[in-house]
Amino acid sequence: EALPEGANEQDEDRNDTGGAVYVTVDTDWLGRPKSIKYTYSSAAPVGTTVDYGPLKVLVVASKAEQGLGTWITHERNVVEDYKQLFGGSPDTTPAAVMMWGDSNTVNGVSTVDFDDILFLSGPTSHPSTTASSDER
């Protein structure tokens, strides 16, 4: 695993990422895809959002908070993230999902592994959080 040194999603000239999942939901009035980029950042802290017009970046993991070489599990509510980032509900279900790692703007190295990506409709809970104390 490797994160691109010098990358920073908050700087358009250095916006490479260690790893990202893009979820494209809608298009804007010009027909450009409206996407959320869930990213593992080399520099920005978890919770950072960046606005590149129809592309919204949301940092869900960061080099500062979590080490390399460890599987990281994330659960996101894409509809709620969309509402917060774009200011309204999506008109459609996701049209595309893309996994990505890049280092071209900083001429570095980015290596990422993805596994077990699952999209669910409706309210869900992680199985480990659904049992009450008397059910165990």
Predicted regions and their residues:
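Extracellular carbohydrate recognition and processing domains
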Residues: 33-86
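Short, charged low-complexity linker/loop segments at the C-terminal edge of domains
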Residues: 122-129
